[in-house]
Amino acid sequence: SPTHARRQWSLSENGFLRYGFLNDFDKAMLALVRKYKVLEMGYAWNLQMDEGNKTIVFNHDDLVFVFNWHPENSLPDYAIQVPFPGRYKMVLTTESKRFGGKGRLDENGRFFSYPHDYEGGCRLHYMQIYNVNRAATVYKRMKG
């Protein structure tokens, strides 16, 4: 019915429902897109697709996006490919308590890439993270 199919913006202001967390995350996500000009970066580059662990990793320039859709498996020391060598910091995660997450990640942590050489002279860079189930996290390469 039209009554139930309409948008109910007041739900995000309702204290006993979790829509407020979703609204807060939406604001933070849009702020990240504006701050780092994600829409001006062109196409995203797929770095990793792990069907078994239900994880996708892609980047837009210095930003690395990690999505883990697995219903149960959180993976410590999970190696993800990164586009550039260096230090990375977490800039956004659905796991944050301010977004209704469980707070299982250290949002102030720093992550360091390491090289891996393959046959034929190919060198790729990786970093290890705690890949939390049902979470999305964004990392940014630190300059200098």
Model-predicted regions and their roles:
Residues S1-G144:
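Carbohydrate-interacting/catalytic domains
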